[in-house]
Amino acid sequence: MRSIVTRWGTHLAVCLFVLPISVSAAGLADVVGEGQIRFLKTKPDPNSYTYESKVTILETSLDSGLVQIQTCHKKLDPIRKVVILFNKDRIRDIQVRTMDGIAMAEVRDNRVTLSEVQKGGSICIDLQSKALDSLGNGLYQLNAGPLMRRLFDGYLPMTANMKFSWPDKLLAVQETKPASQDGVDIKSANDGLEMDLVFAGKMTAQILLKRSD
């Protein structure tokens, strides 16, 4: 059994373990070792695992820290059983929204167990989390990561699309890590932020927000 570990608290962590037989030569060429990260201009294997998330911040979130989260794991590798594990101290109301190419998904406590996952399978999960941390002086931080796709002692390329939304002009983006570069496309507006990433390694994104006056 393999696991996808997800912690939406001070951070989100997704770790996907894959089988060597399911990895293309293009993907293997970009494997990186422990402690390394490489951002890529393009995804070497367009059919490989993709992670998507949408975080909705309400005005009440600034006091409660509670946000709405929608996550999707797409183009999964074939495997008999996989566990998606969430941080039990931060998470509530886990619900499977949709799934395809998966025989069964069981929600219990802070985990979702998937059975008989077919190649290319997908699952989308909705939840709430106390994930918005107040830093004082009107500053807030969201951390997403580490995101990774493991192969033995290395990391394979993957893509992540992360969207963050809030009421118009409620918050202003102060800083993002990583910053815009090859493999990191960032779009910012008065009501949200979107990050598209292509990378190999263990990636953590940080978003610093300030409440608008």
Task: Please tell me what each predicted stretch does.
Residues M1-T6:
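N-terminal secretory signal peptides that target proteins for export/translocation
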Residues T10-P20:
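Bacterial N-terminal signal peptides
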Residues Q95-N143, N190-T204, L208-S212:
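A surface-exposed beta-strand-loop module
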Residues V112-D182:
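Surface-exposed, acidic/Ser/Thr-rich flexible loop segments
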